[in-house]
């Protein structure tokens, strides 16, 4: 898949959440979500902040590095200090103000993404990323934080085949999830077989692998983004 296709799917996923937010009330924006201390407005503010830094990572790496240094500088103060930096400006805005800020930063990111080639690399928090993986990570973010919002408000968001991006990211970052938790990475291969929302089948890993995960793509994506426990899904 070309970077332009990933960018188009990202824009579509953002618009799906935009359409849901268009119909909610000011009280809904203040509703707590599953993320500690975060309201619906904070979820959107998080996307707003990091869509902007993502755009700068593409168009102005030096400016991005300054913002990265700022974030590293407050990280020792805990989650509250990070929230103050990344959400503080938005928390002073009205719900319509937060909504419009997100839309504006989405446009910045879309314009920046349009300059990327398939072989481009983008500076980011941690190692640099290939352009397609970089935009896939942004799609995963809007889908996952969108899930927090639809869960909090009881909204309906039908699954789509754009989940393939999220599932792909979940598969390829398996080893990193162990490393990040200071755990030994298992040597055994894993086969992942998922039923797509469209009815197609998606698969990763060798057939006959000693371990396998099977189920719906939506359940798999909910688990790899830590929005559901495996016991609360139909994954095998």
Give, region by region, the residue ranges found by the protein language model.
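Structured surface interface patches that mediate subunit assembly and partner/cofactor docking
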Residues: 1-6, 23-24, 30-31, 59-71, ...
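Amphipathic alpha-helix face/heptad-repeat signature
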Residues: 6-13, 43, 98-101, 105, ...
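An N-terminal domain-cap segment
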Residues: 1-45, 54
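Short, helix-capping/interhelical loops that line the mouth of catalytic, cofactor-
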Residues: 1-5, 52-110, 114
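Structural signal for well-ordered, non-membrane alpha-helices
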Residues: 14, 18, 22, 51-55, ...
